[in-house]
């Protein structure tokens, strides 16, 4: 059976070797609440050990989009798993949920154990950074479905929060202050546009740009920041009204998701430093300024909304985590998002 299966393009041997290689990486992320080992039909997590009186589970799923194309082009697969974890855990921490466990799904045309190990090592690193465990996953070898050397990756995160401590944004009011935490770069959104700009520029991912201090490829592949530890610290103040993870849709689409009806937001781009990568993308691609804020994070990957009198306390707590906080905007009584110097 295995010989016939292998002749059809599926290698059970490669699959077994891949699992064996990833075990040491998965072990790095283990939490004490995990009740099953790698390979169980279902992964089990003992929620009772969290000692939550009214636990609410919060879940999120995502992938990394066409950023994968850069990983393929450069044969760099060590950090793409961090991106996958980040996209999920940064979403669920928005509502105050501590990430507990993560499952990944990797689909590819041909199983190459060494490559799969590199991908999963990145996933495990993302889990370590966010304090959750890589509790399970699936690696699917599907011949004929993907081009040689290509794959897709997606993930699913589950977190928990005490019901009374859910962050819902329902008490946000005009006059509240919006704090911003820096991004590491483009993160994992907008890469279809990024790839188009690079292709039309005549440059290669291997080319170095002085303004980047690195190659174009390395700058663009910089993994998405995981904000879990910083957010958990800020939540200790019990002063957070709402939070925003800036992903696809940039400022214009993501900020309104957490604002009550009748509220909007105004941002002043002069209040935080612009990353060189966004300056280059805007200039090289001749991208309108409004579109930049509608596609990219523009240097701010995460936002927190607080009362004016709580800015100092929240900023001080984040500073203890070596986090630089920018006061980037305010909540307004005019619905929608307005960016000074962009929206007139």
Swiss-Prot record:
GO terms for biological process: 'de novo' IMP biosynthetic process; adenine biosynthetic process. Keywords: ATP-binding, Cytoplasm, Ligase, Nucleotide-binding, Purine biosynthesis. It comes from the Bacteria. It catalyses: 2-formamido-N(1)-(5-O-phospho-beta-D-ribosyl)acetamidine + ATP = 5-amino-1-(5-phospho-beta-D-ribosyl)imidazole + ADP + phosphate + H(+). Its EC number is 6.3.3.1. InterPro entries: PurM-like_C_dom, PurM-like_C_sf, PurM-like_N, PurM-like_N_sf, PurM_cligase. GO terms for cellular component: cytosol. Belongs to the AIR synthase family. HAMAP family: AIRS (MF_00741). This is Phosphoribosylformylglycinamidine cyclo-ligase. It comes from Exiguobacterium sibiricum (strain DSM 17290 / CCUG 55495 / CIP 109462 / JCM 13490 / 255-15).
């Amino acid at each position: 059976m295995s010989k016939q299966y292998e002749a059809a393009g599926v290698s059970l041997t490669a699959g077994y070797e891949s699992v064996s290689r990833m075990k040491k990486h998965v072990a790095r992320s283990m939490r004490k609440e995990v009740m099953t080992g790698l390979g169980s039909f279902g992964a089990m997590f003992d929620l009772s050990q969290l000692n939550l009186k009214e636990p609410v589970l919060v879940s999120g799923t995502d992938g990394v989009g066409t950023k994968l194309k850069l990983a393929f082009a450069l044969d760099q697969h060590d950090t793409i798993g961090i991106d996958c974890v980040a996209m999920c855990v940064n979403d669920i921490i928005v509502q105050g949920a501590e990430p507990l466990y993560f499952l990944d799904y990797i689909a590819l045309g041909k199983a190459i154990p060494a490559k799969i190990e590199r991908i999963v090592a990145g996933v495990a690193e993302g889990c370590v950074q966010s304090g959750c465990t890589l509790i399970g996953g699936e690696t699917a070898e599907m011949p004929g479905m993907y081009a040689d050397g290509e794959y897709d990756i997606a993930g699913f995160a589950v977190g928990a929060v005490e019901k009374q401590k859910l962050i819902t944004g329902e008490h946000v009011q005009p006059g509240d202050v919006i704090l911003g935490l820096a991004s590491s770069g483009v993160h994992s959104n907008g890469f279809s546009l990024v790839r188009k700009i690079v292709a039309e520029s005549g440059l290669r991912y291997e080319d170095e740009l002085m303004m980047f201090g690195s190659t174009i490829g390395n700058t663009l592949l910089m993994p998405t920041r995981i904000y879990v530890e910083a957010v958990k610290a800020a939540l200790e103040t019990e002063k957070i009204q709402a939070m925003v993870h800036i992903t696809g849709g940039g400022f214009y689409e993501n900020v309104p998701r957490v604002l009550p009806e009748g509220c909007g937001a105004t941002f002043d781009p002069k209040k935080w430093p612009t990353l060189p990568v966004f300056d280059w993308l805007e200039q090289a691609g001749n991208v309108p300024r409004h579109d930049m804020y509608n596609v990219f994070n523009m240097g701010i990957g995460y936002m927190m909304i607080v009362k004016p009198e709580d800015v100092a306390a929240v900023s001080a707590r984040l500073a203890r985590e070596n986090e630089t906080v920018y006061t980037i905007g305010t909540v307004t009584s005019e619905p929608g998002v307005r960016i000074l110097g962009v929206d007139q």
